[in-house]
Each structure stands twice: as structure tokens, then as C-alpha cells.
Amino acid sequence: MSSGSIHVITGPMFSGKTSELVRRIKRFMLSNFKCIIIKHCGDNRYNEDDINKVYTHDLLFMEATASSNLSVLVPTLLNDGVQVIGIDEAQFFLDIVEFSESMANLGKTVIVAALNGDFKRELFGNVYKLLSLAETVSSLTAICVKCYCDASFSKRVTENKEVMDIGGKDKYIAVCRKCFFSN
């Protein structure tokens, strides 16, 4: 087994997870590693016409491959000699754990960016299962939009109760513990 690794970047909305993912991927690219970023095909928040880019909240972008299933990409990743795999919005991929573990066991570096919980502060997807498999876990915070303290939670500001409701500032705010419970 080659020496691969899994690195998890987690935090609430607006904490800079995608920016950190892009920064790490660019760092590997500068060292001539073959890299790819994969995003969920349902994430079209910033450009509905171009699904093959991952965007930060400040509208910086990087080329990406959009998919709803990571496992179907394995043959392409192996054939293309990809060494570093970045995955944005990993909470939306049902096969994130199996994919990340198998790629790391094949010698790939896997960098996963995902929410630390849903809008109710409950586990979101299977990302939490990666924590015990990861070499590193980076937990980011945002700034609470109400009191300007560190914010660890994402609060939905719409009435939709569906767990999967992709959006940005139009649907979510970052809040601290105290402000999560206030109106």
C-alpha cells in the first residue's frame, strides 16, 4: 500500500473551507502534483451555466469536476494519474468515506471540505465518519453576523425544513452558540 492521506477541513458556512481547499490544491499544483477538485453537481450557487468550477464566497474560482457520485470517477482518476484529490461540499456525497479511504490506500492525498453540521446543528451526511480515518482535521470558524464573535454554526434564515438546501447568504448565516438560539 502506498502512503496516501486524508485531510478534513470543516466548519460552518462562510468559514473559508472552499478557500482553504483551493489554497491547498494550488500549493500541490505549484509542486507539479497532478490535482483535481471534485464538487457536487447540485452546487450551482454562483454560476448556473458553468457547473465545472468551484467558487468561493468571494467569487474566486477554480476548475472542478462535477458529480453526484465519487465512485464513478475512480477509473478516470487512476488512468489520469491524479495524485491529489480535493472534494468540496463533501457532506453531499453518500460515498465520501469509502471513496476517500480507498483513494488514500492507493497512495492519493485526499483533501475534503465539508460542513461541520446542518442548519439544526446535527450531523450532515457521512463526513463525521472520516474524522477517525483522517491524518489531519482542521476546524474553521466564521464571524457571527449578529455579535461578531467566533461562529461555529450555520443558521438557516428561510422557512425550508429540507436538510439539503444548497445556498449562500440568501439562505444561511454564520452564528455563535448564543445567537443560534436567539431570533
UniProtKB/Swiss-Prot annotation:
Signal peptide: none
Protein family: Belongs to the thymidine kinase family.
InterPro entries, A to Z: P-loop_NTPase, Thymidine_kinase, Thymidine_kinase_CS
Protein name: Thymidine kinase
Binding, substrate: F119, V163, M164, D165, I166, G167
Positions in coiled-coil regions: none
EC number: 2.7.1.21
Keyword ATP-binding found: yes
UniProt: Zn(2+) binding residues: C144, C147, C176, C179
Positions with a binding annotation for ATP: G11, P12, M13, F14, S15, G16, K17, T18
Gene Ontology biological process: DNA biosynthetic process; thymidine metabolic process
Gene name in the database record: TK
Keywords tagged on the record: ATP-binding, DNA synthesis, Kinase, Metal-binding, Nucleotide-binding, Transferase, Zinc
Single GO MF annotation: metal ion binding
